[in-house]
Amino acid sequence: NYWDAPFLYPYKNVTALSDNLFGTLPIYAVFRSGGADRETAFQLWLLSLFALNFICCFIALNSWSKNVVLSSVGAYVFAFSIYNLGQLDHVQVFPKFIAPLVLFWFWKFLSERKIKYFLFTSLGLIYQFYCGMYLAFMLSYILLFFGIAYFAIYRDRSWLNEFKNKKQLIYFASIIGLSVVLLLPLLKP
């Protein structure tokens, strides 16, 4: 079975000891289903991650700045920097394409207070957990400090009014509940 991978035999449940990359499994599966052997599918998977990192970062930066040149440069650094190329032996650090979008959605949520951006942020963070546990924890810390910095800089106390609205509270609670349910399969392999 998947959780009892043979590389630490006879130890059980070894896949749960590290990043399992479930979130990127569909990408790999497309190449395997298309007839690629496992090494070729792995190479195509890796190239796809580089492309997705660039594309998603470009979308997030361009949505923020509306400047194609700056967005392209930022996305290039995010996807192809020397740090990334130096990590080719550690492929678990590459499925981070959702992170720039999550940061963008979180900013939109803080600045516009639309519940849909909280939903997108939550689902994106959960997806990052499925793509890579360690990257997701780092993204969680970034979101935490991003939120703290936002409130420290803007000193926006009108946010408290959002929590007086019962309908908003129900939406927040529902999204948090959904997030917990979606994370449960990773917690109980």
Name what the model sees in each region:
Residues 1-53, 76-96:
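Membrane-interface coil-to-helix junctions
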Residues 153-168:
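Membrane-interfacial, low-structure loops and terminal tails that flank and connect transmembrane helices
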Residues 22, 36, 115-119, 158-161:
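Juxtamembrane loop-helix boundary motifs flanking transmembrane segments in multi-pass membrane proteins
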Residues 2, 8, 129, 164-167:
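Intrinsic low-complexity, intrinsically disordered segments enriched in polar/basic residues
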Residues 1, 184-189:
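Short, intrinsically disordered, charge-balanced linker/junction segments flanking boundaries
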Residues 45-64, 69-153, 172-179, 185-186:
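Membrane-embedded helix bundles of polyisoprenyl
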Residues 1, 112-113, 155-158:
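Short loop/turn hinge sites at secondary-structure boundaries
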